[in-house]
Amino acid sequence: MTPPRPPSGRVRSLRDYSSESEKMDGTGSWDTLEWTKLDSTSGSGSFSNLSCLLESERVIVEGYGVVLINTDEAGTLLVTNFRILFLSEGTRKVIPLGTIPLATIEKFNKMVLKVQSSPRQSDKIPPRRLLQVTGKDMRIIVYGFRPRTKQRRNVFDALLKCTKPERVWDLYTFACGPSKFGNANPKERLLNEYFRLLGKSSIRASMDMIEDGAFTLSNELWRISDLNSNYNLCQTYPFAFMIPKSISDAELLQACSFRARCRLPVITWCQPGSGAVIARSSQPLVGLMMNMRSNLDEKLVAAFCSQLPGAKGERRKLYIADARPRKNALANGAMGGGSESSSNYFQSEIVFFGIDNIHAMRESFSRVRDYLDMHGTTSSDGRSSFLRHGGWTWGGGNLSSMSASVSLLGDSGWLIHIQSVLAGAAWIAARVAMESASVLVHCSDGWDRTTQLVSLACLLLDPYYRTFAGFQALVEKDWLAFGHPFSDRVGMPNISGSGNFDFPRQSSSAGSFPSSPVRQSSGSAASQSSSSSHGHNNYSPIFMQWIDSVSQLMRMYPCAFEFSPTFLVDFMDCLLSCRFGNFLCNSEKEREQCGIADACGCLWAYLTDLRSFSATSHVHCNPFYDPLKYDGPLLPPAASLAPTLWPQFHLRWACPEEAKAADIGVQCRAMTVKYSEMQKEKEAAERRVDEISFAMESLSAELLRERHLSWVARESANRATKEYAALTRAVQSLGCKINFTTSDVEDDPRSSLENNPRRRNRHGNNSDVSVSISLMPEENTSGNPKGRVCEALCPLRTREGVCRWPEVGCAHVGSQFVGLKANFDAFDRLAIYDSYFQPK
């Protein structure tokens, strides 16, 4: 079915009508268009064969004549089982800003904008129907729909259904399946990382090893335990973890009860050579009075203080880093939690990092997103920040307005939180690298702030984690295996079938549209209905905050990472979209119960496949990477930890041009690609020059051969001419005459070879020539012997055959042969005897 088109040719956008409204005192509106009375209620099949559709992606609802308010583009909106797809009206190209995966949507609202009518207008202008979609990837999108249709309602209902799957199996990734991006068992990769940390990289894990329980390797200090192979010890811990070799499994069973959710202290990274470790756990259950103790927990923690190498009996220091603010740790004591006391733990020191909880991070993220939308070039109200509040904020507005705009970013607190995470991780890395101390990190549950700190510290300490393979190993170990609740934090359904969703379907509360698509003087906005993807209040961008922190380190050390900021952006987009199964559910146990590894595609395999076609020239590769220079720990000083907005992620929707300009790697890569193309063109030109040179040499050699053959031919012709002349004179001296005749021309005594060269040439080329020698008549020789002799022998005669004697001297005058007549019959009468030839 052909989508309906307005008679005017192009669907006019909201900005067109808002400008007309200003010119005509509010008389213009979308109603000026004669819309076709066709309301698409479901997928009609006209877009089922789009090349942009992914595997197993199908169109559910279509909306025609939709306007993307952010960029004032008209097009077609499609809701599929994977995403909202916005296609430009003319070319049907995908508009990236208007295209967003369903799982990436944080919330969406139906908005109604009431436009005031002009006094000169008799008809009432219908309200403009808008749909605002807020993404988890820092963008706010607003779509404008045609009036007097049910398109917005159909799209809204489809989003309610598709963004609220009842079970995790209803996600698109299960419909797509593993495809060509199969997922190897993550347990094998986790064991391989443990083997590397233990110094046994030559051993490779296998499923047979896991099934037989033959993976419990060890070195002098640490060992791998299989106590949690059935997840009976701790449901949110991996099936295997590293602990001190001196601690038995029986002691672990007793010690785990003293930690929240049984997340006992285990090793997440150990430094080769020195024996220093970074350990992680949840908070201890010390109680309100902070007087509860566990001897086995204290013994386990003390085992991290192994003996220093080269020191006689001296053991290393232990730092216990509590990621929470001190007051929060004390408040947790009222619920049975709390923090350790340095007097109870051997050679330890307690440090509080003061990082806020998930709720503060969620609020901060929302504020910085609103700031970017309000002051970006592609705002959700369709206007630039230059025209905010009806005036030129930067060009001629008042100074207080400018200051207020700038302060909004600081008020969001996002950069302050990033700095807290960076400072904490840098402090941990410095203690391990400079003091060879061990550090135990925990927060409340040990899966949010703890994971941020230990993984970022490992990234600073171990250069392996700054490669593609190492980054994957780090994320799978510290984030996935140790149970960061991705389902809760990203806002996805979990294994129990109840996701973190709360959709009030009939909430008709009036509200203020954060960024009105037209000037507030032209009308008012109201929220008719809204939806949210984190009703249970567990949604929080914890992992995104960590990725942001990694990008800050890449800004400080641009040559220390194999991957580029673009890789982090694409990696984050894949995670939020739920296109792959790696980050589904809340723990390793839940992913195993769902069969994620077998049923879904692998994000890592997909990213590796993208790079396989371009090798080091791919946008995911860092062109400045120098592994030889940065082969040790990175220890940034405190002054360098001041963060900035991450342009490639934060600004890509609000300020796309500025985001591209900020990526030096992209510019360098473009120059590299251009240089590579020019190098290829140069090589092709050089090959062409070589071919032409070879051809010229061949032609020159051929020309030399031809010249040689020509010279030989000329010499042969000259020699033949001389021989012919000599033979002619000899024959004529005997009184004979040479005649040339052909088979088709009668003999002509006047056509001798020397007297008619043109005929000679014709005979030589076109006729069969016969040569005859005849005797000259006697009367011709007896009458004028001198003339005969001169005619035959004298080289001084003229071309006409006239003798030039006596003007010139003649060697033949007076010769004894003048007038000599040859008698050939006498030769026949000669008697020749054989005895003449006998030897004497």
Curated annotation (Swiss-Prot):
SUPFAM superfamilies: (Phosphotyrosine protein) phosphatases II (SSF52799), PH domain-like (SSF50729). GO terms for cellular component: cytoplasmic vesicle; endosome membrane. Residues 507-535 have a biased composition (Low complexity). It comes from the Eukaryota. Residues 666-734 form a coiled coil. Residues 45-112 form the GRAM domain. CDD domains: PTP-MTM-like. Its EC number is 3.1.3.95, 3.1.3.64. Disruption phenotype: No visible phenotype in normal conditions. Impaired accumulation of PtdIns5P in response to stress such as dehydration, leading to an increased resistance. Mostly expressed in siliques and leaves (including hydathodes), and, to a lower extent, in flowers and roots. Its main location: cytoplasm. Substrate binds at N332, G333, A334, M335, N357, I358, C443, S444, D445, G446, W447, D448, R449, R489. InterPro entries: GRAM, Myotubularin, Myotubularin-like_Pase_dom, PH-like_dom_sf, Prot-tyrosine_phosphatase-like, Tyr_Pase_AS. Residues 13-25 have a biased composition (Basic and acidic residues). It catalyses: a 1,2-diacyl-sn-glycero-3-phospho-(1D-myo-inositol-3-phosphate) + H2O = a 1,2-diacyl-sn-glycero-3-phospho-(1D-myo-inositol) + phosphate; a 1,2-diacyl-sn-glycero-3-phospho-(1D-myo-inositol-3,5-bisphosphate) + H2O = a 1,2-diacyl-sn-glycero-3-phospho-(1D-myo-inositol-5-phosphate) + phosphate. It is a peripheral membrane protein. Residues 199-650 form the Myotubularin phosphatase domain. It is found in: Cytoplasm; Endosome membrane. Residues 1-28, 506-535, 745-771 are annotated as: Disordered. The keyword Coiled coil applies. The active site is at C443 (phosphocysteine intermediate). GO terms for biological process: cellular response to water deprivation; intracellular signal transduction; lipid metabolic process; regulation of response to water deprivation. Induction: Accumulates upon dehydration. Phosphatase with phosphoinositide 3'-phosphatase activity that can use phosphatidylinositol-3-phosphate (PtdIns3P) and phosphatidylinositol-3,5-diphosphate (PtdIns3,5P(2)) as substrates and produces phosphatidylinositol-5-phosphate (PtdIns5P); participates in pathway(s) that transfer gene regulatory signals to the nucleus. Required for recovery after water deprivation, via the accumulation of PtdIns5P upon dehydration; high PtdIns5P levels mediate ATX1 cytoplasmic localization, thus down-regulating the expression of ATX1-dependent genes. Confers sensitivity to soil-water-deficit stress. Belongs to the protein-tyrosine phosphatase family. Non-receptor class myotubularin subfamily. This is Phosphatidylinositol-3-phosphatase myotubularin-1. The lineage of its organism: Eukaryota, Viridiplantae, Streptophyta, Embryophyta, Tracheophyta. The gene is MTM1.
